[in-house]
Amino acid sequence: GLVITRYGHDVQRPLPDRKILVCEAAHPVPDEAGLQATKNLLHIVQALQKDDQLLVLISGGGSSLLTLPVAEISMSDLKSLTQELLRSGAPIEAMNVVRKHISAIQGGNLGRLAVRAGAKVDALIISDVTGDQPGDIASGPCAVDDSTFQDALNILDRYQIGPGVAPASILDYLKKGTIGQAPETLKRDEPESLMVRNHVIATSMQSLLAAQKYCLEQGAQVHILGDQITGEAAQVARDQLEIVRGYVEQNQNKDFADRPGKFRRQVFISGGETTVTIPQGVVGRGGRCSEFLLALYAHSKDLAGLSALAADTDGIDGSEENAGAYFDQEIIHHANTLQLDEKTYLDAHDAYGFFLEVGGLVHTGPTLT
């Protein structure tokens, strides 16, 4: 067997006779190590025989780690496009439509290859996307795909990644696909699609329910705002603050005490996949969760006693090594003492830098999801 994971995430746990090779590669922008690891995986699939069973474990990050561009597209061009997509503010589902159509392994191609070799295929999937659709997770290496080459071109156009920005090799290949000169992703009417089974075994909502259970055990009252939250991270933060403010205003004259003199804590929990649009010329540091939290901090000065945490369930938020960030009254006091201007950090998309200064970064290491 073979595992492809992010650099630093090979936990070196004992494996029976070490028959499972662990390869590390880059995320979120793919690299040559990921390309070689994916080629190794392809060799395993090509060696399958009739009635073999292929078990595929899929989780977030696979769109980058499992990387094998079609022959017409170089790794250099794939890296360039990935960087543009990440800066564009496109939601992950849209990004993955493009990725599927320039990949020899995603968009159901892994499943298709295994079935054509005569194998039975089961994919066990941990979802990190809204909607929990197998085709959206890691760009769906074993899943059917309803999108088209034209959809991919439309997405690049919508996010202004057209000629002069996207590599010409990629635009040319996508255009060939629209006129039938390149193979489509795995479709529902293909016989191979019936031989691949996808099972989503963990979702964002399960994480929210686990957090809810813990908070209830601590005596708090919990409000789940949903597990399908999308949009620009900073705007989502402002929207959720309005929900909190509305709750406070409606209930400020009510007694929510568990017992006289002690008010019950209120906890608001949400999950989803936000986006961050990075303007040209801005480098930025951090990820969606950290930016969400910095915007929440910047716009919540009127809410006394507020504490907040935002983190990725896989332990990595964007470009750095932190899972996310948090703030409480001590962090707020420290930021005020340092006289940091959170708006400057927000404009620079440097949430990582802000929370590094105030000691609010959250580090979990690999969570193995």
Task: Kindly give the residue locations of the regions a language model identified.
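Accessory alpha-helical/coil subdomains and C-terminal extensions
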Residues: 118, 122, 144-239, 243-246
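Internal helix-turn-beta structural module
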Residues: 282, 293-369
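Glycine-rich oxoanion-binding loops at beta->alpha junctions
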Residues: 3-50, 98-99
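Glycine/threonine-rich beta-strand-loop-alpha-helix active-site module
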Residues: 1-11, 15, 21, 66-124
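Proline/glycine-rich low-complexity loops and linkers
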Residues: 24-25, 29-33, 86-115, 316-345
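A glycine/threonine-rich phosphate-anchoring loop and its flanking beta-alpha core
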Residues: 92-161, 173-174, 360
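Gly/Ser/Thr-rich active-site loops/lids in small-molecule metabolic enzymes
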Residues: 73-90, 145-160, 281-308
